[in-house]
Amino acid sequence: MSDSQTLVVKLGTSVLTGGSRRLNRAHIVELVRQCAQLHAAGHRIVIVTSGAIAAGREHLGYPELPATIASKQLLAAVGQSRLIQLWEQLFSIYGIHIGQMLLTRADMEDRERFLNARDTLRALLDNHIVPVINENDAVATAEIKVGDNDNLSALAAILAGADKLLLLTDQQGLFTADPRSNPQAELIKDVYGVDDALRSIAGDSVSGLGIGGMSTKLQAADVACRAGIDTIIASGSKPGVIGDVMEGISVGTRFHAQASPLENRKRWIFGAPPAGEITVDEGATAAMLERGSSLLPKGIKSVTGNFSRGEVIRICNLQGRDIAHGVSRYNSDALRRIAGHHSQQIDAILGYEYGPVAVHRDDMITR
């Protein structure tokens, strides 16, 4: 084995169930065995687990429930405890303790809570405890959810200071087309940057048990790679896949980490789920992307959502493309009032000002 590394392993519902309606315990046993072997060799392992809703549905005998958020949260509340018990039971076979962390988007949006979560996660790792992370589906609403465990795993990798992120799925990796419908589809083995062409070929999962598809895995890979973390999408059913990844053996699709990774504050900005969105005109788009300029109120066309000063927001061009994330200097109501106006007019419009820019270039990451 090489020197100690930190690996985040994300296990989707389709991997944990094998595409069935219940958890595939035999397969989970094998995945834990691989993780335990790496743990014994001195590596630091973080698990990001899906499967709470599937576990709850199985435990309750597959009840007929309405397709509502409340039903999903009911199943998650029942299943989360069952799921963590399973992880605890299996890792205890190898004398390994686990620590559960349930996160929501609010833990990532707020810088102080982000740092607290980071400190907790790293304390677990420093004490040779395997963190088991999931989104707090039992209480999270659409407004406070990260949205899927792919993006959650990228955030976990940033929190952990991971070397590698492994996204295990029901596919071998990213293909040039959907291999389920196109026999000519070829596996893409290496990716050196996520672009629009790559996003256009990403399809969706068809397991029906989870909410993450290949597009969310691309988002996660983009975030992790820009933070300096190699990301691999591979099949969870491939024998020895976790060990192979740690050994550097080529499996699935490898997204190579950015050579000059973002510094810590910008990792948070890039990874934090946006609290709102603004659309900017062509002049502002060119200024930010081509000249690295700050965003001025004059270039703002519209503001979507309600957010506070200091929160991370998404910046889109007129075609709706996500071109940047940044920390807003003004809240959403203030931005709506000063949108399209020159910076010299801010004080006259609002009665106060926090400077001439809406988002400063030092608080911005372009996509």
Swiss-Prot record:
UniProt xrefs under CDD domains: AAK_G5K_ProB, PUA_G5K
Residues where ATP binds: K10, T169, D170
Species per Swiss-Prot/TrEMBL record: Salmonella paratyphi B (strain ATCC BAA-1250 / SPB7)
Keyword Oxidoreductase among UniProt keywords: no
Catalyses which reaction(s): L-glutamate + ATP = L-glutamyl 5-phosphate + ADP
GO cellular component: cytosol
Taxonomic classification: Bacteria, Pseudomonadati, Pseudomonadota, Gammaproteobacteria, Enterobacterales
A GO term, aspect molecular function: RNA binding
Domain PUA: 275-353
UniProt pathway: Amino-acid biosynthesis; L-proline biosynthesis; L-glutamate 5-semialdehyde from L-glutamate: step 1/2
Protein name (record): Glutamate 5-kinase
